[in-house]
Amino acid sequence: MLDIKYVRENPDAVKKMLEMRLLASESKKIDELIRYDSERKAKVTESDTLKAMRNSVTQEIAKIKREKTGSADELIAEMKIVSDRISEIDAELREIETKQEELLLAVPNILHESVPEGKSAADNVVYKEVMDCKREFDFKPKDHIELGKSLGMLDFERGAKIAGAGFPLYIGKGASLERALINFMLDLHLEKHGYKEVFPPFFVNRDSLRGTGQWPKFADQVYYMNDDDIYAIPTAEVPVTNMHRDEMLQSKELPIKYAAYSACFRREAGSYGKDTKGFLRVHQFNKVEMVKFVLPETSYDELEALLGDAEDVLKALEIPYRVLLLCSGDISANAAKCYDIEVWSPAEEKFLEASSCSNFEDYQARRAQIRFRRQPKAKPEFVHTLNGSGLATSRLMVSLMENYQTPDGKIQVPKVLQKYMGCEVIG
């Protein structure tokens, strides 16, 4: 979340950010937030003044009793009234702080100056295209659904029978290819890019969702287990970022870089009418996530490095892709800047999102209270957090299967995956 001090001192900048994010109607909440902040400060001042008075008079009462110079009954009665008023003020203060925090949690992140202004995905800027490995087919390429069925790799019908639509079932070489992708990506990030592996819980509590910004605003997108008051993770970003919630780090530890595999679960509420066939939109998918905790002054260099780490996966697999710089109307509420990586689907003849790489600056760290000290006795500061998909396997599987298909309906296994698969061709 934003620093209330920043909101108080820069209300116009915050309102401009809301306008750029197509949330101009929320501007009145900034005025309300500042009003609560003024009320809070006034209540704190009043409470502190009365507490100082009570402490002083309490000492006077003790002196009167000790020296037996008179009756302290009148002062005691007055302090009873003062104490009752302090209790009232403190209760009012807690209520104000709760309302202020609710409003502050809902305010999106300030956008980096390099984020282009725009209204929708159509206004995203193509940052780069890497299409030199694009294959030209002399036959009509099949889509991943047809390939998966004909080769006995995927069974969406049985997946739907087991759990419902949007829960794919991998079989045989399909399961092997999925596992190969996960292991390859983890090995690449650990051995080449210097990340530390984490295998996190697939369920988290509300504090964890709050820390990364999915709660309360996006709670309707997450699967919730009511009896246990616990949530299925939408991404490994949530448990991995919260590893350091409420912790004080030292600058010499930074950057901290984690790579984690997890299954991801998303309700995809509001996705009706969108392309939902096959892997294009599912409720459960697999992903390797990269998470960084870095010094504030290095976070944008670290973002470019994070993007490069994700791109290395596609370069090694020789899959065509492009990188988009997301505009103000399409970027997530938590991110200050974000790149999307899209892979090429020959059958669909379009790009499919396979990764997002984001810098949150101190937005998540402030919510999760992840701080560091530059020196042992230095003032604590908030770290900057970043994360990126490295990558999500569902759309990657689509692109891989379609790009590597042969005229006779088989799939060539990319060279970097052959040692994991134990074969060169599927089919």
From Swiss-Prot:
It holds the Pfam family tRNA-synt_2b. GO terms for molecular function: ATP binding; serine-tRNA ligase activity. Signal peptide: none annotated. L-serine binds at residues 235-237, 289, 389. It catalyses: tRNA(Ser) + L-serine + ATP = L-seryl-tRNA(Ser) + AMP + diphosphate + H(+); tRNA(Sec) + L-serine + ATP = L-seryl-tRNA(Sec) + AMP + diphosphate + H(+). Its EC number is 6.1.1.11. Pathway: Aminoacyl-tRNA biosynthesis; selenocysteinyl-tRNA(Sec) biosynthesis; L-seryl-tRNA(Sec) from L-serine and tRNA(Sec): step 1/1. The keyword Ligase applies. ATP binds at residues 266-268, 282, 353-356. GO terms for biological process: selenocysteine biosynthetic process; seryl-tRNA aminoacylation. It is found in: Cytoplasm. It comes from the Bacteria. SUPFAM superfamilies: Class II aaRS and biotin synthetases, tRNA-binding arm. Homodimer. The tRNA molecule binds across the dimer. Consists of two distinct domains, a catalytic core and a N-terminal extension that is involved in tRNA binding. Catalyzes the attachment of serine to tRNA(Ser). Is also able to aminoacylate tRNA(Sec) with serine, to form the misacylated tRNA L-seryl-tRNA(Sec), which will be further converted into selenocysteinyl-tRNA(Sec). Belongs to the class-II aminoacyl-tRNA synthetase family. Type-1 seryl-tRNA synthetase subfamily. This is Serine--tRNA ligase. It comes from Chloroherpeton thalassium (strain ATCC 35110 / GB-78).
